[in-house]
């Protein structure tokens, strides 16, 4: 009798109850009629290595990795993609048939695809891009923008030293500007990106003067709770096109689903609704 192996994937984090990934992948499994499972896994830090090596034996094809384990996932992998190595973090792990663990980072891909989908005609090559923040999310965004051909990225962070460290990692197309003077560097920018937590539910607002920003410039926020952050509301009020952060979450999930379940999923309004469902 032939044994049929049902594919399993999941998401690892601590805490994990906030993750929207199960909603996305279970929606796709239903839509494409795939018999498979996607489960949230609450893991303690000291158990991460053991869990990574146990999951393939339990039938797992791979996992997404969320906070606080994205950096450690790199260390536990046998092979690391170039972009994950540059970013220094992985969010997509694939357990290969030969027993090796492959680590990738699809956050930057999700960011770029979200902008291309949400702002038709947007191009990273058009003009300077202003990025706010220098944390882990900013690394993924910078990597993707430079790979996509951005001519200049102006980076501002409340702690300037962190921005300078990113500039050292990413090279001459990244310039560091003062956090308090960033508004004055926007007059020729065509994209403004917020990668900080400012404006997120429960966090202080991002207080930023957009008067110098061209009204043609696309404004995007990687935060998706709330969908319309104060920054996006301010941009809409002055006529700028805006792209919310939810699409980044949706698009970054697609490559992993394809690797684990064999189907390239579509990003649809129904998927957005599933992601927002409580």
Swiss-Prot record:
Catalytic activity: shikimate + NADP(+) = 3-dehydroshikimate + NADPH + H(+)
A Gene Ontology biological process term: shikimate metabolic process
SUPFAM superfamilies, per the entry: Aminoacid dehydrogenase-like, N-terminal domain, NAD(P)-binding Rossmann-fold domains
Example of a GO cellular component annotation carried by this entry: cytosol
Pathway, per record: Metabolic intermediate biosynthesis; chorismate biosynthesis; chorismate from D-erythrose 4-phosphate and phosphoenolpyruvate: step 4/7
List of residues binding NADP(+): 82, 133-137, 157-162, 222, 245
Subunit comment: Homodimer.
Function: Involved in the biosynthesis of the chorismate, which leads to the biosynthesis of aromatic amino acids. Catalyzes the reversible NADPH linked reduction of 3-dehydroshikimate (DHSA) to yield shikimate (SA).
Assigned protein family: Belongs to the shikimate dehydrogenase family.
PANTHER family: BIFUNCTIONAL 3-DEHYDROQUINATE DEHYDRATASE_SHIKIMATE DEHYDROGENASE, CHLOROPLASTIC, SHIKIMATE DEHYDROGENASE
Full protein name: Shikimate dehydrogenase (NADP(+))
Taxonomy of the source species: Bacteria, Pseudomonadati, Pseudomonadota, Alphaproteobacteria, Rhodobacterales
């Amino acid at each position: 009798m032939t044994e049929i192996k049902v594919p399993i994937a999941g998401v690892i984090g601590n805490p994990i109850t906030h993750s929207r990934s199960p909603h996305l992948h279970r929606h796709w499994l239903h839509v494409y009629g795939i018999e498979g499972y996607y489960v949230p896994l609450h893991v303690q830090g000291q158990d991460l290595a053991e869990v990574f090596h146990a999951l393939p034996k339990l039938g797992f094809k791979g996992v997404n990795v969320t906070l606080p384990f994205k950096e450690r996932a790199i260390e536990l992998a046998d092979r690391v993609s170039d972009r994950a190595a540059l970013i220094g973090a992985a969010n997509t792990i694939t357990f290969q048939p030969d027993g090796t663990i492959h680590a990738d980072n699809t956050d930057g891909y999700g960011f770029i695809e979200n902008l291309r989908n949400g702002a038709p005609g947007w191009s990273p090559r058009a003009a300077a891009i202003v990025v706010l923040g220098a944390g882990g999310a900013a690394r993924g965004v910078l990597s993707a923008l430079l790979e996509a051909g951005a001519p200049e990225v102006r980076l501002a962070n409340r702690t300037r030293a962190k921005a300078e460290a990113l500039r050292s990692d990413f090279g001459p197309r990244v310039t560091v500007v003062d956090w308090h003077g960033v508004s004055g560097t926007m007059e020729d920018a065509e994209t403004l990106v917020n990668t900080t937590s400012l404006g997120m539910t429960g966090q202080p607002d991002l207080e930023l003067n957009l008067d110098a920003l061209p009204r043609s410039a696309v404004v995007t926020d990687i935060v998706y709770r709330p969908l319309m952050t104060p920054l996006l509301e301010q941009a809409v009020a002055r006529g700028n096109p805006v792209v919310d952060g939810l699409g980044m979450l949706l698009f970054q999930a697609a490559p992993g689903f394809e690797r684990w379940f064999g189907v390239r999923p579509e990003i649809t309004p129904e998927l957005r609704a599933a992601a927002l469902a409580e």
